[in-house]
Amino acid sequence: MDPKAIKEELRLFQSTLLQDGLKELLNENKFVDCTLKIGDRCFPCHRLIMAACSPYFRELFFSEDGKEKDIGKEVVLDDVDPNIMDMILQYLYSAEIDLVDDNVQEIFAVANRFQIPSVFTVCVNYLQQKLSMANCLAVFRLGLVLSVPRLAIAARDFIADRFETVSSEEEFLQLAPHELLALIGGDMLNVEKEEVVFESVMKWVRNDKANRVKSLAEAFDCIRFRLLPEKYFREKVETDDIIKGDPELLKKLQLVKDAFKGKLPEKKPKEKKEGEVNGEEEGEEMLPGFLNDNRRLGMYGRDLIVMINDTAAVAYDVVENECFLAAMAEQVPKNHVSLCTKKNQLFIVGGLFVDEESKESPLQCYFYQLDSFSSDWRALPPMPSPRCLFNLGESENLLFAIAGKDLQTNESLDSVMCFDTERMKWSETKKLPLHIHGHSVVSHNNLVYCIGGKTDDNKALSKMFVYNHKQSEWRELASMKTPRAMFGAVVHKGKIIVTGGVNEDGLTALSETYDFDTNKWDTFTEFPQERSSVNLVSSGGNLFSIGGFAIVELEDKNIGPSEITDIWQYEEDKKTWSGMLREMRYASGSSCVGMRLNAARMPKL
């Protein structure tokens, strides 16, 4: 056996034996020489244990020369919750403590007050692991109050990642000036526009104008005015009544206006301090913070095509021809359906997965959301009606899984499952007028459109239905010119574009476009090859086609379906499809969506 392992095993055995023995002595009230009195409750303990675990109690019980102080057996502790101290004492003797969200901050404060580092560290670790939108500001403030840099920095970074959302919370308006400045000053703020920072500061000031106006000059140094559009600066910043009333702020604004014209204040050499020699601390003074034009972390966002398969989610930048790893995806089943919402949230649902350990419900329809901050998939409640060949739509905070094939009966469905992203619950909503599978779904202005598909008798449809969730109503609209199933569909520049697919005549390359205002379908530029299962994506104002299946000559010289992994772009001025990449290996077996992601946060492939 490895000597280090033997040593660790012996240490663990001895510490366990010692701890069990000490707990037994406490339970049997043996060698007890101290009582902590809190209100009307008393807690027996051992001075030696308290002194060993806490510098506070060591100083209380012993003098600097190591002699025991004669302070009596009873130690009175004021302003302490006896239940909290009881939990801490039990931890010191057993290494067990039941931390929950409701008690951790109070335990943390008591451990800090009485200098009990073991409990303190356990609480810090718990709070770091449990950081959430609900507690991040409280944890940040706690870390500052108790002077715990590790916790304050972890909470600050969490808030910086989600600044736009956190800054809209009521608790944000309660921050002290030094707390606000600690959040908004850094490069790591995840905001796409500096307007968000300016508006959050002014909202914070107005929440307590009488007391906070005096802090605005300091907050100004954290706002990067040169990153604001000049039009916004003129219309929103210069006209603000609070700013106009402060001569000091107006001087700073004049420097910003000069900077917009290309005139920056001269950088003066740093003054030498007494004792410095040439070469030490040389350089120029930095520009004031309000003239800082370094981009924040969130300003590196790009419109990307995200390809998700059962191996990874890869984001492709068409303009730069670069790929980034958005997340590994081993837990994502094949043949899932993906959707990127208006709020830029990526969800994937379904895929064929058989849980052999579950006898009651072996077929599972898993459900994940991409956490772009941690580059990981967050598991959500599985869809209760396992199905394949369905599709997804959205309306406000609701997702809709529409029709498809039942995984157990293999029959087409008309049911529509609805997931509330705020309540985190699935429910069933108004059924589709038809039983179909292999259809496409798009969303526009909080309405959900179900297009084409196949019935159980293998007949391709040209019908289109629109769903209004507020009215719980499906309504039939104009039909496509060509019946089709397993085709690409996307909303691009305010119109629906469909291309490819399969019908009774085989694969098709025909494309169509739908005008929402006139309720009419028109012919769109035909795709260069007959294909099914095409991924149509609208990204950065451009239309792309990724992959699909075509009938080609196979390696054995027979003719059959084969997956294609190329990328095409539609050139609007020429009204033609232009080939961009002959092969994109990450597109194999992938669903594809257009999504805005931060390239600075993802490893480049």
Curated annotation (Swiss-Prot):
One of its GO terms (cellular component) is cytoplasm. One of its GO terms (molecular function) is ubiquitin-like ligase-substrate adaptor activity. Kelch repeats lie at residues 345-397, 398-446, 447-494, 496-541, 543-598. SMART domains: BACK, BTB, Kelch. Disruption phenotype: Knockdown of klhl41b result in reduced disorganized muscle without any other significant abnormalities. Knockdown of both genes (klhl41a and klhl41b) is lethal by 3 dpf. Double knockdown fish exhibit severely disorganized muscle compared to controls and either of the single knockdowns. Pfam families: BACK (PF07707), BTB (PF00651), Kelch_KLHDC2_KLHL20_DRC7 (PF24681). Transmembrane segments: none annotated. Gene3D superfamilies: 1.25.40.420, Kelch-type beta propeller (2.120.10.80), Potassium Channel Kv1.1, Chain A (3.30.710.10). It comes from the Eukaryota. CDD domains: BACK_KLHL41_KBTBD10 (cd18517), BTB_POZ_KLHL41_KBTBD10 (cd18341). One of its GO terms (biological process) is swimming behavior. The keyword Membrane applies. Residues 32-102 form the BTB domain. The keyword Repeat applies. Involved in skeletal muscle development and maintenance. PANTHER family: KELCH PROTEIN, KELCH-LIKE PROTEIN 41. This is Kelch-like protein 41b. It comes from Danio rerio (Zebrafish). The lineage of its organism: Eukaryota, Metazoa, Chordata, Craniata, Vertebrata.
